[in-house]
Amino acid sequence: MTKVKKVKYNKRKHIKVGDIMQNKLTKREQSKQNNILAIQTFKNQGYTVAQTAELLRLSKRTVYRYWDNTDYKIFNNISEVKTETEQYITKEKYKYQIEKGKDLDYEWEKILSKRKEIATYTELKNEKGNKLWFVETEKIKSAIDYIEIKAKDDLLKYSKSLFKNYISSEEMLLDSLADESFYSSTIEGAFSTRKVAKELVMDKRVPSSKSEKMIYNNHMALKYGLEDKESQITEDLMLKIFELISKDTLDEETQINKYRVEDVVVRDTRGEIIHEGAHVDNIQSMMDDLFRFMYSNDINPIIKSAIFHFYFVFVHPFPDGNGRTARATSYIYLVKEGYDIFKHFSISALIAQKKSKYYKCIKDVEDNELDMTYFIEFILGVVSESIDIILDKYTRKHIENYIFMELVDKGVNITNDQKKIIKYILNKENYSATIENYTKKNKSSDYKKVNKDMNYLTDIGILTKSKEGRHNLYSINVIK
């Protein structure tokens, strides 16, 4: 078994504090500059991307981004450092960054003008006839590159190994659909647990409350969409998805045949109005525009799915269930477009954690002249982060399976308690834990017994032992 040699590396030492103060380098810029220098140093020393990510405690995505140093230009004078992926801020944020004495409206208009010069204008419009647009920022390009190339390759590599030897693809899909059904419903106010969601999906338990019905309905809608044989998403498919999502959850007075017949508003987590849905007389024409847009241009499908998501919520065609229907339909669209990697994880899981930001991005589009860049960057960021999470999960599972297969091949037997220790350490962020960590987490564990088990696992080469202060630190002795 091989192990990456642990080395101490101080990313900050390459930039002097005086330089930072003198040139007013922001904390964000400083952090990025430090990351670049650290990554380039490890690359030059022959480390791989995975090893560099582990040693610097960065995500693989971050390391990939800086590996060939294409996103950031390093100059001798730090004050000249410019990021090509400069944060795409709103006017609301810009007013805190503008130099004293400069006119906010005038300076912002210059920024807006430059953005519009390179923007992509869509055929989607608001009720006043103004087109929605976006800028394909370096952040968006980087996310698409990661999703389509790096993530796809790694997910396929790990998933093929896992499905071949340890779990079924059906089991993985059910697990992912259970998560998506649960989190998409909680965003809209359902109260339940992941355990209940998995019971509803995997054990086919009958839902007993409105919240459980929302989760179950969401699952049935996703399942229906994935089994649909048509190559494209259509209005009829979307209406069927809504029908399944809203079944037995709408109040009697809000039951509808197709689209809503009353005007509505969208509220954020604090109950504040962030958007007024389209007037009932305009819903049909705007939805027609949306489905026509999905198949009438060469915009990247990942960007297009984010636009579909936004515009659907923007129009708000139904009295309830708009968010769930938008997320389910955009998910199904991506799978139909050949992005099977989206079957591996739940996008809604992170949206649920970032719910305030989610609603804020919707509002930012309206407050900044229908610029959808804010929402697209947010959604693609969520997708990229979701991929990081599932890749980390697959990597840990892959290492776990590798360890246990090695033990079987070598005829080494270990106890169930020792297996639990291995699994516990594999789930720790840095693949390391002390005896104190383990016994605190597992209150019934006997300290002496755990000490004996960890030392045995060290003796047979599964773990390594080092010092962390006064305690022994046990780490997984395999990087595969």
Predicted features and spans:
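Short, Lys/Arg-enriched anionic-surface-contact patches
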Residues: N10, H14-L37
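Short, amphipathic alpha-helical "recognition" segments used to contact nucleic acids or chromatin
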Residues: S31-Y47, N427
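FIC/Doc superfamily catalytic core
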Residues: Q33, K60, I74-K480
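Charged, alpha-helical scaffolding/interaction elements associated with membrane systems
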Residues: N44-Q45, N69, S296, I460
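Short alpha-helical "recognition helix" segments of helix-turn-helix
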Residues: Q51-A53, Y438
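Conserved hydrophobic/aromatic packing and binding residues within compact polymer-binding modules
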Residues: V63
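DNA major-groove recognition helix of helix-turn-helix
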Residues: W67-D68, M454
